[in-house]
Amino acid sequence: MRRRVYVWEVPVRLTHWVNVACIVVLSFTGYYIGNPYITVSGREPYAPNFMGLMRGIHFVTAYIFIASILLRTYWAFRGNAWASWRGLFPFLTREGRKNMGHALQYYLFIRRHPPEVAGHNALAGTTYMVIVFLYLLISFTGLALYGLLHPASIWWPLTGWVFTIIDAQTLRLAHHVIMYLLIAFAIHHIYSAWLVDMEEGNGLMSSIFSGFKFLRMGQQPDWIENRMVVAKVEPQPQVAPSEQPASD
């Protein structure tokens, strides 16, 4: 018997898909800016401006990405328990550390089943803490590189100090390396989400579209709190058991 629980609120799902789209566009345009692999004929009227077009798309998408990060940060303090910033620091509680150990044992093939949680397991929460840090770092390095080429912009006074510590080429390399790390994470994220969905049968993959997951009745409380988090629960309709045949 399972119950339907509203886990991922609209801002969580919205920022998730905005981030996905932004990372795809930023990776494509960013790689081109660093290594122009599309040859444009000089006879085409837009040929001299093709790099400018790619850079323009990159910059606009970067601002959308930063806006999405800010919205998700705001919702980490306003949303439900599964959207909370506490989910990024599971190691601060005993329940979180226990859940993290369970998840790690599952991924190392020591345990047969993953931990049953409504939101992210504690190991995933720690991973997302690293991902948020990478989001901030790639945004900062990108704005610093932009400010270097546009010293009249607001970003040069805010980020120019970094070039007294590190040279531009090293900063650009860091920007590219973080991009590859995020791409690698995305591949692992899709695989692990599909795996856990198949193992638990809780609708994990569809939940990022609908917001709902399906949890077993009597499932243990999430590691985020030492009690069952208040949620919008919609019990599944129950089918009345068939009458037992009379014994002779």
Would you name each region that the model predicts?
Residues 1-248:
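Membrane-embedded alpha-helical bundles that constitute the cytochrome b-like, heme-associated redox core
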